[in-house]
Amino acid sequence: MDGGLCFNSWSDYLGLSSLISRGLQPREGGESPRPRWKASSPTPAEPLPSKAAEAHGHKGCGFCRSNREAQSLYSSHRLRAPDGRVLCPVLRGYTCPLCGANGDWAHTMRYCPLRHFLRHPHSPRDGQ
């Protein structure tokens, strides 16, 4: 195999280290980064899951339920809209430290598309 085509985890060909470093630096104007788990402004009202969805175990937002939020919170909204946009106000306020995604396309580090590129080849796979 040609050595030039192999991925070298010690070289930063994609420039990800600078992307991450920029995300860790204070913002211009002395503004400090916003808290990562602050709830964002509410999204337009979305219908709650139907009775059929609830019968199949879909009882509100799985993200909030997994994080042991109150039932009144996690049952008040869904995690995602049918088109894939994030509806959860808690997750919408989170900014992924790897890629900077938030709002409609927010996700945690576990679901970040860049995590596969940043993982050390000999590290365990997320407890799996």
From Swiss-Prot:
Q: How does it assemble?
A: Interacts with ccnb1.
Q: Where does Zn(2+) 1 bind?
A: C61, C64, H77, C88
The record's comment on protein family reads: Belongs to the nanos family.
Q: Report what the protein is called.
A: Nanos homolog 1
Q: What the record says about its domains? A: The Nanos-type zinc finger is composed of two C2HC motifs, each motif binding one molecule of zinc. It is essential for the translation repression activity of the protein.
**Where do the segments described as Disordered lie?**
23-58
- A GO CC term attached to the entry: germ plasm
Provide the primary localization. cytoplasm
**InterPro entries in the record:** Nanos/Xcar2, Nanos_sf, Znf_nanos-typ
Where does the secretion signal sit in this chain? none
Q: Which gene encodes it?
A: nanos1
Q: Where is this motif: C2HC 1?
A: 61-88
- Organism, as annotated: Xenopus tropicalis
- GO terms for MF: RNA binding; translation repressor activity; zinc ion binding
Q: Motif C2HC 2: where? A: 96-112
Lineage in the entry? Eukaryota, Metazoa, Chordata, Craniata, Vertebrata
Query: Its function?
Result: Acts as a translational repressor. Can mediate repression affecting different steps in the translation process: cap-driven, IRES-driven, polyadenylated RNAs or nonpolyadenylated RNAs. Essential for the development of primordial germ cells (PGCs) by ensuring their proper migration and survival.
Keywords of this protein's UniProt record, alphabetized? Cytoplasm, Metal-binding, Repressor, RNA-binding, Translation regulation, Zinc, Zinc-finger
The UniProt record gives the binding positions of Zn(2+) 2 as C96, C99, H107, C112
